[in-house]
């Protein structure tokens, strides 16, 4: 690739600085394509998740414990898109870090915190959907706004504490000081943690994922049983009361929400599993993964932050209506917050 450039064969991130990292640039064509692909992901993550947050906060019909969790998840994904992805894009394509050591630590801390915050949010959302579908009568009293607030707080505090410990205490580098020193160069920003913290990171992914798989498996079984009961009830009693009809519609909506969020969980697993496996392999096999494979795995997790709004837009009619009202400027008009987003 260096044959396409007039510079010396060996390029450095900082040509006139001792201890500079070696630069491995892409040729112009792939470079432009990568900037477009990564940039599109960042824009989608920022704009899409911002629309989710605005929708939930503005429209009163969406003010529910479950939707507050979704808005908080979107906030985490929004922060990934605006504070992590643009700088990671430059690092991935230029193979150099040009933003200083202090910001490297902050960027890495935000990267880990916001991404794992998304994981915990999805786990709590699965708990919410499980209660809503399996025990709908007591759901309003079990999963209240205060309970949702506690879940949101945990989803933010734990990842922030963990990532701060990793990047600001030095404890994660204990036992691998020689490796950290060998990889340290001017213009680099590489996350290197010891095996103990790699295992902790794996558990932060594995335990919530296992909880989600178990709960959504139960949700789909119960939802299938409920669908059969409702179909039998409706066919056997054409003259059902409006109250019973309303309950059936609400139950159907809850099941659809559970299925939609189930798709979100599947997308999350597809995005995160390669990176998690790669991190484990590297930690115990001596960083054998090629750089380009590692970058693909990393950007898989980043792109997960951009996928959720697309899933909502595809499956949630209320989100489509909210987007139309926001983009058309209708939300600036009086009483727009009381718009009916669930009308048939």
From Swiss-Prot:
It is found in: Cell membrane. It is a multi-pass membrane protein. Gene3D superfamilies: Rhodopsin 7-helix transmembrane proteins. Keywords: Cell membrane, Disulfide bond, G-protein coupled receptor, Glycoprotein, Membrane, Receptor, Transducer, Transmembrane, Transmembrane helix. SMART domains: 7TM_GPCR_Srsx (SM01381). Pfam families: 7tm_1. Disruption phenotype: Mice lacking Taar2, Taar3, Taar4, Taar5, Taar6, Taar7a, Taar7b, Taar7d, Taar7e, Taar7f, Taar8a, Taar8b, Taar8c and Taar9 show no visible phenotype or behavioral deficits. They however show an absence of aversion to low concentrations of amines such as 2-phenylethylamine, isopentylamine, N-methylpiperidine and cadaverine. Disulfide bonds join 21-185, 104-189. GO terms for molecular function: trace-amine receptor activity. Residues 53-67, 133-146, 217-260, 304-344 are cytoplasmic. Residues 1-31, 89-111, 168-195, 282 are extracellular. One of its GO terms (cellular component) is plasma membrane. Specifically expressed in neurons of the olfactory epithelium. Glycans are attached at residues 4, 18. The chain crosses the membrane at residues 32-52, 68-88, 112-132, 147-167, 196-216, 261-281, 283-303. Belongs to the G-protein coupled receptor 1 family. Olfactory receptor specific for trace amines. Trace amine compounds are enriched in animal body fluids and act on trace amine-associated receptors (TAARs) to elicit both intraspecific and interspecific innate behaviors. Ligand-binding causes a conformation change that triggers signaling via G(s)-class of G alpha proteins (GNAL or GNAS). PANTHER family: HISTAMINE RECEPTOR-RELATED G-PROTEIN COUPLED RECEPTOR (PTHR24249), TRACE AMINE-ASSOCIATED RECEPTOR 8 (PTHR24249:SF405). This is Trace amine-associated receptor 8a. It comes from Mus musculus (Mouse). The gene is Taar8a.
């Amino acid at each position: 690739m260096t044959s396409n450039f007039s510079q010396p064969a060996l390029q450095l991130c900082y040509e006139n600085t001792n201890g500079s990292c070696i630069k491995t640039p892409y040729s112009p064509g792939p470079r432009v394509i990568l900037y477009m692909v990564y940039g599109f992901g960042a824009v989608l993550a920022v704009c899409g998740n911002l629309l989710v947050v605005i929708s939930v906060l503005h429209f009163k019909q969406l003010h529910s414990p479950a939707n507050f969790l979704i808005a908080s998840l979107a906030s985490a994904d929004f922060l990934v898109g605006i504070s992590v992805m643009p700088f990671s894009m430059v690092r991935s394509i230029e193979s150099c870090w040009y933003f200083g050591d202090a910001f490297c630590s902050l960027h890495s801390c935000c990267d880990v915190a916001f991404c794992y915050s998304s994981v915990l949010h999805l786990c709590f959302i699965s708990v919410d959907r499980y209660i809503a579908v399996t025990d709908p009568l007591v759901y309003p009293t079990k999963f209240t706004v205060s309970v949702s607030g506690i879940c949101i707080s945990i989803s933010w505090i734990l990842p922030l504490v963990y990532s701060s410990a990793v990047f600001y205490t030095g404890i994660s580098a204990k036992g691998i000081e020689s490796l950290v020193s060998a990889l340290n160069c001017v213009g680099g920003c590489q996350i290197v943690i010891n095996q103990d913290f790699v295992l902790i990171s794996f558990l932060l992914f594995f335990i919530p994922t296992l909880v989600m798989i178990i709960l959504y498996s139960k949700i789909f079984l119960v939802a299938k049983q409920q669908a059969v009961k409702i179909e039998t009830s409706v066919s056997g009693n054409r003259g059902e009361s409006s109250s019973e009809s309303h309950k059936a519609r609400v139950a159907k909506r809850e099941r659809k929400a559970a299925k939609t969020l189930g798709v979100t969980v599947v997308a999350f697993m597809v995005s995160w599993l390669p990176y998690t496996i790669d991190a484990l392999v590297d930690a115990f096999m001596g960083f054998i993964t090629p750089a380009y494979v590692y970058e693909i795995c990393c950007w898989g997790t980043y792109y997960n932050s951009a996928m959720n709004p697309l899933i909502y837009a595809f499956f949630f009619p209320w989100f489509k209506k909210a987007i139309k009202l926001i983009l058309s400027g209708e939300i600036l008009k009086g009483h727009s917050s009381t718009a009916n987003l669930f009308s048939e």
